[in-house]
Swiss-Prot record:
Family the UniProt entry places it in: Belongs to the TmcAL family.
Protein purpose: Catalyzes the formation of N(4)-acetylcytidine (ac(4)C) at the wobble position of elongator tRNA(Met), using acetate and ATP as substrates. First activates an acetate ion to form acetyladenylate (Ac-AMP) and then transfers the acetyl group to tRNA to form ac(4)C34.
Catalysis performed (reactions): cytidine(34) in elongator tRNA(Met) + acetate + ATP = N(4)-acetylcytidine(34) in elongator tRNA(Met) + AMP + diphosphate
Protein name: tRNA(Met) cytidine acetate ligase
UniProt-recorded Gene Ontology molecular function terms: ATP binding; ligase activity, forming carbon-nitrogen bonds; tRNA binding
Organism: Syntrophotalea carbinolica (strain DSM 2380 / NBRC 103641 / GraBd1)
Top EC class for this record: ligase
């Protein structure tokens, strides 16, 4: 069975995602669509609108066949680490191709940028750092350096828009890991990532949809019908994360002091002082981010740092986990066609597939050996995923008392597509 891989967050699943899913199947000639999806905390440094099981349910009801979770260290990471972790998951599953959306829609142009960054990576990093010290923003600085090295006009390089940036990192990850997956890209339809407008076909950005939900507006026309029901249920039960709760939990962590903060991932010299100063007076989450942000770090970078603080992510451990890559595959759900694919691909799967968390410790021990470094890292990676679920539950105003160790009780979803 030919399978196409999708790298996703589905925050939430909307009409643009449905277009991407259908166009990806067609472009790759695939019978099965396999999504690797972020868990409770996302690449831009924020909690997901819905928990990972509800987002997996939306995806499966809308036609995705397999949903596996991208472990926390990669889901809440910079674009290169996010891309590499996701590509490694799909490759380990035995997926044939990868199809991603981009503003450019030009695979050749994206591949040329990926090649330039691979061949001139050190030069790009050094010269970009110089421009950052002069006060230029990161995206503009990197575009200018790449333009100088390639001899192209910076405006013609697809290095500004967020989906192009991720697409380039997916292509770099395919090269770096030696993956045989064939890449495809399709043009993103509708509004841009930061755009609140609604485009043709009732396609809006996920961020625009979240803003509408926060203002109490209806978004039914922007979502496929099966996703409408899931979002409506979570909204009625007050199960969207609350920014005030997030802010208070972060303050409790920051008040542990600068020595503690300096032990965490990406809390660099100077940021710890800004965090403690901001925590003393900030009134909400957005004010905290604004007070800490400096020109050389993007807002997204600061938000990710705050998610590391919330989840107590130690610097030395995170570096080791990112270097190791994903060490297991957590199945969130599948369709009958997806289960057939997983069964057929079992022998060529290169990472242990976790379907029952109560047996994962013995499963990892058998795979890696009880005294191996990979076993130690796999347990640490698992602990971060479990911690993310516990902490996410603390952000939900309507939490009903269900166990915060929900990872141990939720079996993989078994869902037929509803459309």
């Amino acid at each position: 069975m030919r399978a196409v891989g999708l790298i996703t967050e589905y925050n939430p699943f909307h009409n643009g995602h449905l277009h991407h899913l259908r166009a990806s199947r067609e472009a790759a000639g695939a019978e099965v669509a396999v999504a690797v999806m972020s868990g409770h905390f996302l690449q831009r440094g924020e909690p997901a609108l819905l928990d990972k099981w509800r987002r997996a349910e939306m995806a499966l009801r809308c036609g995705v066949d397999v949903v596996v979770e991208l472990p926390f260290p990669f889901a809440c990471a910079s674009a290169p680490h996010f891309a590499r972790g996701a590509v490694q998951c799909l490759d380990a599953l035995g997926v044939d191709s990868l199809c991603f959306g981009s503003e450019s829609g030009d695979l050749g142009a994206l591949q040329r940028c990926a090649q330039l960054l691979e061949e001139c990576g050190e030069q790009v990093a050094e010269r970009t750092a110089t421009l950052l010290r002069r006060g230029m923003h990161y995206a503009a600085a990197r575009s200018q350096v790449c333009a100088e090295l390639s001899g192209c006009d910076a405006a013609t390089l697809p290095l500004h828009q967020p989906n192009n940036i991720l697409g380039i990192e997916y292509l770099r990850a395919l090269r770096a890991t030696g993956s045989a997956m064939q890449p495809f890209t399709i043009s993103r339809l509708g509004a841009g990532y930061h755009d609140d407008a609604v485009g043709p076909g009732n396609i809006a950005s996920a961020s625009g949809i979240r803003k509408r939900l926060a203002m109490g507006e209806t978004v039914d026309e922007l979502l496929p019908a099966p996703a409408v029901d899931v979002v409506a249920g979570a909204r009625a039960d007050r199960l969207f994360p609350d920014e005030d709760l997030l802010h208070r939990l972060l303050l409790a962590q920051i008040f542990r002091g600068r020595d503690y903060l300096q032990s965490l991932y990406q809390v660099e010299s100077g940021i710890d002082a800004r965090l403690t100063d901001a925590a003393a007076t900030s009134r909400d989450w957005q004010a905290l981010v604004d007070a800490v942000k400096v020109r050389q770090f993007t807002r997204t970078r600061i938000q990710r740092t705050l998610m590391y603080i919330l989840n107590d992510v130690r610097g030395d451990l995170m570096a080791s986990l990112l270097a190791a890559g994903p060490l297991y595959l957590r199945l969130l759900g599948s369709s009958p066609r997806g289960r057939a694919f997983l069964g057929a691909a079992r022998k060529r799967r290169r990472l242990p597939m976790v379907t029952n968390l109560s047996r994962i410790y013995s499963q990892l021990k058998r795979t890696y050996g009880p005294r191996s470094e990979d076993y130690r890292l796999a347990l640490a990676m698992l602990e971060l995923d479990l911690r993310a679920t516990r902490n996410y539950s603390l952000l939900l105003p309507g939490w009903s008392g269900v166990s915060r160790e929900r990872d141990f009780f939720e079996a993989p979803l078994d869902i037929h597509s509803a459309i």
